[in-house]
A protein has these predicted regions:
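Short alpha-helical scaffolding segments that buttress acidic/His motifs in well-ordered protein cores
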Residues: 60-65, 114-118, 157, 208-212
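A positional/architectural concept
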Residues: 26, 32-63, 68-79, 83-86
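A general alpha-helix detector
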Residues: 59-64, 96-100, 138-142, 174, ...
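Alpha-helix C-capping/helix-to-loop hinge sites
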Residues: 48, 63, 67-68, 84, ...
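Non-catalytic interaction surface on structured domains
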Residues: 44, 52, 56, 103, ...
Length: 223
């Protein structure tokens, strides 16, 4: 995973490395040249870029917490949940009381999903060391075998942990709404409409998606 890195402290877990994809500047240059909306959006956000904390368990756990809620709501619940364990590690999560997890704002279903995720990591059921060499669809197939992880969550993982450059998460409500607002004056948008718009984004669909998200919510999306 090629990336430029800087150290950032985390109040709950040990210091992690924040990383931005090395391809970001190249992608932005391409998108500004190929797409009228990107030409308008990208300069609005200056040097801001996608960042990953580089931890696969945290990335997937945050994706589960963020399912079907706004970016702001997801951040609030995550902060409450992340304050519970001594460290955000699978073994620590498995020691938490269900009532405490529910009190943090997690639904019963999301609690089940997070526990199952932690068990998959602790049990060595995931090919974590092989992910960097696997293609997108192979990784998605492995991840969707975990309860609570569907294609959307797997695609968030590809974007935010592995920083794959050309992921188009068509199940993402924010992406569809953003395409509607930015390209179709707010009119309803189908998946085929979204695919057609994204033709100009290739091979940098992940980057364009990130800017579409930012156009809807000033709070950067992070997992």
């Amino acid at each position: 995973m090629a990336a430029s890195k800087k150290i950032a402290s985390d109040a709950v877990t040990p210091p992690l490395v924040l990383a931005t994809p090395d391809y970001w500047a190249e992608a932005c240059k391409h998108l500004v040249k190929k797409d009228r909306v990107m030409k308008r959006l990208i300069p609005q956000f200056g040097d801001a870029a996608l960042q990953t904390k580089g931890d696969p368990f945290i990335t997937l756990a945050r994706s589960i917490v963020g399912q079907q809620v706004s970016v702001k709501a997801a951040q609030t619940v995550w902060e409450r949940f992340a304050a519970l364990p001594r460290s955000m590690k699978p073994a620590s999560v498995l020691k938490l009381k269900i009532d405490d997890m529910r009190a943090a704002g997690l639904s019963a279903r999301k609690v089940d999903y997070l526990v199952d995720l932690a068990m998959h990591f602790e049990g060595g059921k995931l090919h974590v060391k092989d992910w960097a060499a696997m293609d997108d669809e192979a990784i998605i197939a492995e991840l969707v075998a975990i309860r609570g992880i569907g294609r959307w969550t797997a695609e968030m993982f590809l974007i935010f942990y592995l920083m794959r450059p050309n992921v188009l998460p068509l199940d993402d409500v924010g992406l569809i709404n953003g395409i509607s607002q930015n390209y179709f004056s707010g009119d309803p948008v189908s998946r085929s409409d979204a695919r057609e718009v994204a033709e100009a984004w290739k091979p940098w669909c992940s980057v364009a998606t990130w800017y579409i998200w930012r156009s809807l919510d000033p709070l950067p999306v992070t997992y």
